[in-house]
């Protein structure tokens, strides 16, 4: 059976390409989603991409994932990385393997960005590879999860 991957992007990631391009690059979220969908499709997998600026909407999407037959989640939680216990709890409650992705290297940035509420329960964490981090996460999910 084909793998089913859910790609989640949190607050402000809809601004990729225009928000601080010196930090996040010039690729847009549409570029990321298009490349991710194509990568999964070429491997015979299904990838569904979803972005929201709202914590509760992301939690609802995570909770629905198990019922939808999602096999793995790739999530860039944006700023919720450093503040959302609720997002962590939602991911823990569905017990689906997930990879945390960050476009920038959060450990080279402001001190408040160094802590992630999600990393401790993630299968893996990828940061600082630009949008190539998504490619790496999808590749890992397809091979290992």
Curated annotation (Swiss-Prot):
Against PROSITE patterns, the record matches this protein to: DEHYDROQUINASE_II
Provide this UniProt record's keywords sorted from A to Z: Amino-acid biosynthesis, Aromatic amino acid biosynthesis, Lyase
EC number(s) recorded for this UniProt protein: 4.2.1.10
Q: Which reaction does it catalyse?
A: 3-dehydroquinate = 3-dehydroshikimate + H2O
Q: Name one GO molecular function term.
A: 3-dehydroquinate dehydratase activity
- The entry's active site is 24, 102
Q: Matching Pfam families, A to Z?
A: DHquinase_II
Q: Which CDD domains match?
A: DHQase_II
The UniProt site entry described as Transition state stabilizer is assigned to 19
Pathway stated in the Swiss-Prot or TrEMBL entry: Metabolic intermediate biosynthesis; chorismate biosynthesis; chorismate from D-erythrose 4-phosphate and phosphoenolpyruvate: step 3/7
Q: Does the keyword Amino-acid biosynthesis apply?
A: yes
Example of a GO biological process term: quinate catabolic process
Entry annotated with the keyword Manganese: no
Binding-site residues for substrate, renumbered to this chain: 76, 82, 89, 103-104, 113
Top-level lineage group? Bacteria
Q: What does this protein do?
A: Catalyzes a trans-dehydration via an enolate intermediate.
**What family is this?**
Belongs to the type-II 3-dehydroquinase family.
Q: What's the subunit arrangement here?
A: Homododecamer.
Name used for this protein in its record: 3-dehydroquinate dehydratase
- Per the UniProt entry, what species is this protein from, by scientific name? Herminiimonas arsenicoxydans
User: Top-down, what is the taxonomic lineage of the species of origin?
Assistant: Bacteria, Pseudomonadati, Pseudomonadota, Betaproteobacteria, Burkholderiales
Q: Which gene encodes it?
A: aroQ
């Amino acid at each position: 059976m084909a793998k089913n991957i859910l790609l989640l992007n949190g607050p402000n990631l809809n601004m990729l390409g225009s928000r601080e391009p010196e930090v996040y690059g010039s690729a847009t979220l549409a570029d990321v989603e298009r490349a991710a969908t194509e990568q999964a499709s070429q491997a015979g997998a299904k990838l569904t991409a979803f972005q929201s600026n709202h914590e509760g909407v992301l939690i609802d999407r995570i909770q629905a994932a198990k019922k939808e037959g999602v096999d793995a989640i790739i999530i860039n939680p944006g700023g919720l990385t450093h503040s959302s216990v609720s997002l962590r709890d939602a991911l823990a409650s569905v017990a689906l393997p997930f990879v945390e992705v960050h476009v920038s290297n959060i450990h080279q940035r402001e001190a408040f960005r160094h802590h992630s509420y999600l990393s401790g329960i993630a299968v893996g964490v990828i940061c600082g590879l630009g949008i190539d981090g998504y490619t790496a996460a999808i590749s890992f999910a397809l091979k290992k999860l």
